[in-house]
């Protein structure tokens, strides 16, 4: 009995130490983000009041999306098929119309004085508000936004994404922390109902070179194991060479989506995907997929 008691005590101590370390890491990660957040907030200027354009119908869903339990194929969108890969690629802008010289905004100049890896700022009202960094795809899995070793990690842009070009598809990764840190808050799109989606359908992702808003068109739980029927290598679709490839990607993520939205997605739209682990299985990913608000649309409803 004394041996059993001692063993239980050791297990308790180990668990307690692990739990303390877990919350210490989260606290440090939040402090690192908070420091950058203060810098970012201080550099933001309120725009002059202007008339707000009426939102385009395709920028907001027109009906409450219904949660689905099993994937169903969606109707194929009728699009003009490009004759060549070059023709298809030309549907995306070759540069930033409002920033052809690729000038880094003052906000990010100040942020990069604290960490040169800062490339963007991601926010969803009442859901998340975090800096986005970029290096290789492993560093910020184990380092916080200040670059310090930390198991909580930080949000980071996939290493394949080149912000110097208006990349057709941006992917941001982050840990799914149980108490909501990093991308832990994204699980709300999975666990809550369609009303939550409707109230939090818009994403702001400002980068070194542009400020942009996106509207969510799908929320999907997918596999990254090629043997599974719901396998989707979302990270491999940085660019699209033809209509078939575009339809395959957009069609698959819509098919697997928890919601059926009225948000249309067309070639030439710039996509943004937020990716995090889903559950205990390392092969599962929760994806929140959005497309950029088009000129003339508004995220205001």
Regions found by a protein language model. Name each.
Residues 1-11:
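N-terminal Sec-pathway targeting helices
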Residues 12-301:
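Solvent-exposed, non-transmembrane regions of membrane-associated and secreted proteins
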């Amino acid at each position: 009995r004394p041996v059993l008691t001692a063993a239980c005590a050791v297990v308790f101590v180990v668990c307690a130490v692990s739990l303390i370390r877990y919350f210490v890491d989260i606290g440090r990660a939040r402090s690192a983000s908070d420091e950058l957040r203060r810098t970012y907030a201080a550099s933001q200027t309120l725009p002059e009041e202007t008339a707000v354009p009426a939102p385009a119908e395709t920028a907001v869903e027109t009906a409450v999306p219904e949660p689905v339990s099993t994937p169903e194929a969606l109707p194929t969108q009728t699009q003009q098929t490009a004759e060549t890969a070059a023709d298809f690629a030309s549907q995306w802008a070759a540069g930033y119309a409002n920033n052809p010289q690729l000038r880094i905004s003052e906000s990010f100049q100040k942020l990069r004085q604290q960490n040169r890896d800062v490339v963007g700022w991601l926010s969803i009202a009442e859901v998340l508000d975090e800096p986005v960094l970029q290096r290789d795809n492993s560093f910020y899995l184990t380092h916080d936004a200040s670059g310090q070793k930390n198991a909580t990690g930080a949000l980071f842009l996939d290493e394949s994404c080149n912000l110097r070009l208006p990349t057709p598809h941006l992917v941001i990764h982050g840990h799914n922390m149980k108490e909501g840190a990093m991308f832990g808050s994204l699980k709300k799109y999975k666990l809550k109902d369609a009303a939550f989606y409707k109230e939090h359908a818009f994403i702001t992702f400002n980068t070194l070179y542009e400020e942009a808003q996106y509207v969510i068109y799908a929320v999907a739980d997918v596999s990254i194991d090629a043997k599974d029927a719901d396998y989707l290598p979302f990270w491999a679709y940085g660019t699209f060479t033809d209509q078939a490839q575009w339809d395959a990607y957009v069609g698959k993520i819509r098919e697997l989506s928890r919601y059926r939205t009225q948000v249309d997605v067309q070639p030439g739209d710039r996509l943004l995907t937020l990716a995090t682990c889903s559950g205990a299985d390392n092969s599962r990913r929760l994806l929140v997929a959005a497309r950029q608000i088009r000129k003339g649309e508004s995220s205001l409803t």
